[in-house]
């Protein structure tokens, strides 16, 4: 399977700062494809939402760097999925705790895509979306 990746965010026309973050990581193994991608959309009505977006994407990066050497030799796809889901829940809790402890309005939506071999898995926190683009575009 050929995989092409690209990542970009933009602050848009109305914001002074970009509260969005995006990461995409791909294993360098030719045999066992592993891709983790995550886009976080900061909540514009919260002044410091870029903090939440950065916490989430940095957490996905740490997770990928830690897991990539274990798949598939030590962990099968099911174990990787379970570990990723736990990580997303923990990152969401981390953002919530940061907000409560500091009394700071931060928050973001998050959509993540995990690809292992020929299968893909989608994770959401909030209302962001992921699309599959072939001859046409379809929300997944």
Where are these regions (language model features)?
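PP2C/PPM-type serine/threonine phosphatase catalytic domain
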Residues: 1-140
């Amino acid at each position: 399977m050929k995989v092409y990746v690209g990542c970009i965010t933009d602050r848009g026309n109305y914001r002074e700062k970009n509260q969005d973050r995006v990461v995409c990581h791909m294993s360098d193994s030719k045999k066992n494809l592993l891709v983790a991608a995550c886009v976080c959309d900061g909540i514009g009505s919260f002044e410091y939402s870029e903090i939440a977006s950065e916490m989430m994407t940095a957490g996905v990066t740490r997770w990928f760097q830690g897991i990539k050497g274990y798949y598939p030799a030590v962990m099968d796809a099911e174990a990787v999925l379970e570990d990723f889901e736990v990580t997303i829940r923990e990152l969401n809790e981390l953002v919530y705790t940061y907000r409560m402890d500091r009394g700071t309005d931060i928050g973001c939506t998050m959509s993540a895509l995990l690809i292992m071999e020929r299968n893909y898995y989608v994770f959401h926190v909030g209302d962001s979306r992921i699309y599959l683009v072939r001859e046409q575009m379809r929300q997944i």
